[in-house]
A protein has these predicted regions:
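Active-site glycine-centered loops adjacent to acidic/histidine catalytic or metal-binding residues
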Residues: 66, 94-95, 144-145, 238, ...
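N-terminal active-site segment of His-dependent metallophosphoesterases
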Residues: 52-117
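N-terminal secretory signal peptides that target proteins for export/translocation
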Residues: 1-29
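A short C-terminal boundary segment appended to hydrolase-like catalytic domains
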Residues: 326-384
Length: 384
């Protein structure tokens, strides 16, 4: 059975849906049947406030992005929460430091720092004052556009963060994938339990490249194969895929990004239609926003969309919310998403918002309290 879905050309073309949808729908009844069938399969996701009652998860993980500007104050507080909750790992979706100018947290400690001195120590500062806070908790890194600002390059990024890009979990997955595995670099995946976590790279306008798309197609085909054991797919990236509620600051900004990002969305939609629990998480925009693909563009093809989130709240200068943002979206906050893996294979995502006291309690020695306060109260853009 076929449905009309936008493909890489940006026009309406035909793409085959997965076997789950193929067995139950006709083109004329696609929207109604998919809504019913996905509900039966438990595809829908909810975002609950931290106070909500929920079934005990099997395990949890944490994710956010954009820790430039004030991340040296915010990330230790995120790490403290992650450790206290016993999360399995923390996933950073990119933009570790500002690079184009010194970050406010570093200027608070070194007010006379020059730009060239800042750029020479920014990445080590990220490792020392942000990632070190997590201790033995595994940390997975994604590349943001600020990791593409000179003097940093793609090759430089791979060299600097090689120990994170080739973690034991990723290296083991590479062995399992065999000849189709991606070499150590900014895109990779690993399977934990029955969940496949996929890190994509859209930090530059050369992405998504043909090689990255070919690799992703292999990974998804593997997940969709009978007896793969994969029940959920979580895809993380820096910039949101096109035509989301955050389209003003996403892959819509360049032609290749629009075309290839739309293609990736249709692939993930197809995986969801085939019965997998699929979730897409991005940062880049410095706010929290759920249901980002619940837009007229994607709903013209099906009333059921892939659950998606923006969580760029790990310390970067906060942005105003777009007018199209979901009613539960929030800005002028710091925090992260916690994913709770359920026994039915679904994942419940909860926003964990930080207080100023959280930042104070987790601060590094000699951190000025007035600098923390300034980052918590200010560090925002009024107009974009």
């Amino acid at each position: 059975m076929e449905a009309f879905i936008p493909m890489i050309t940006g026009k309406l073309n035909k793409v085959r849906l997965g076997s789950c949808a193929r067995n139950i729908v006709s083109r004329q009844r696609l929207a109604v049947a998919l809504r019913a069938s996905l509900a039966l399969c438990g595809i829908l996701v909810s975002v609950r406030p931290a106070s909500a009652q929920a079934a005990a998860p099997l395990w949890t993980f944490a994710v956010s992005g954009d820790s430039r500007n004030c991340g040296d104050f915010v990330m230790p507080a995120i790490a403290a929460k992650v450790k206290a909750d016993g999360d399995a790992f923390y996933w950073h979706l990119g933009d570790f430091r500002w690079i184009s100018s010194p970050d406010e947290d570093l200027l608070a400690m070194h007010p006379d720092m020059k730009r060239e001195d800042y750029q020479s120590l920014a990445w080590d500062d990220f490792l020392t004052h942000q990632i070190a806070s997590f201790g033995s908790i595994p940390v997975f890194l994604g590349r943001g556009n600020h990791e593409n600002i000179k003097p940093m390059t793609r090759d430089g990024y791979i060299a600097k963060f090689s120990s994170f890009l080739d973690r034991p979990e990723i290296a083991a997955q590479r062995i399992t994938d065999g000849s189709a595995a991606a070499p150590p670099g900014p895109w990779y995946h690993w399977t934990q339990g029955w969940v496949d976590f996929i890190t994509l790279d859209n930090a530059s306008q050369e992405e998504f490249s043909t090689s990255q798309l070919k690799w992703l197609r292999f990974v998804l085909d593997r997940d969709l194969a009978p007896n793969s054991g994969v029940r959920a797919i979580v895809v993380g990236m820096h910039e949101a895929l096109p035509h989301s509620t955050g389209s003003e600051h996403a892959m819509d900004d360049w032609d290749l990004g629009d075309r290839t990002g739309s293609l990736v969305y249709t692939w993930l939609y197809d995986a969801q239609a085939a019965g997998k629990h699929v979730y897409i998480i991005a940062s880049h925009s410095h706010y929290y926003s759920p249901a980002i693909f619940n837009t007229p563009y994607w709903k013209q093809y099906s009333n059921e969309v892939v659950p998606g989130f923006i969580i760029g709240s790990a310390g970067a200068r906060r942005y105003p919310l777009p007018r199209s943002a979901d009613k539960d979206a929030l800005t002028h906050i710091y925090g992260f998403l916690q994913g709770a893996v359920q026994s039915d294979g679904s994942i419940v995502f909860t926003l964990h918002e930080l207080t100023e006291d959280d930042l104070i309690q987790a601060r590094w020695q000699d951190t000025p309290l007035d600098a923390i306060h300034d980052c918590f109260v200010n560090n925002a853009e009024s107009v974009r």
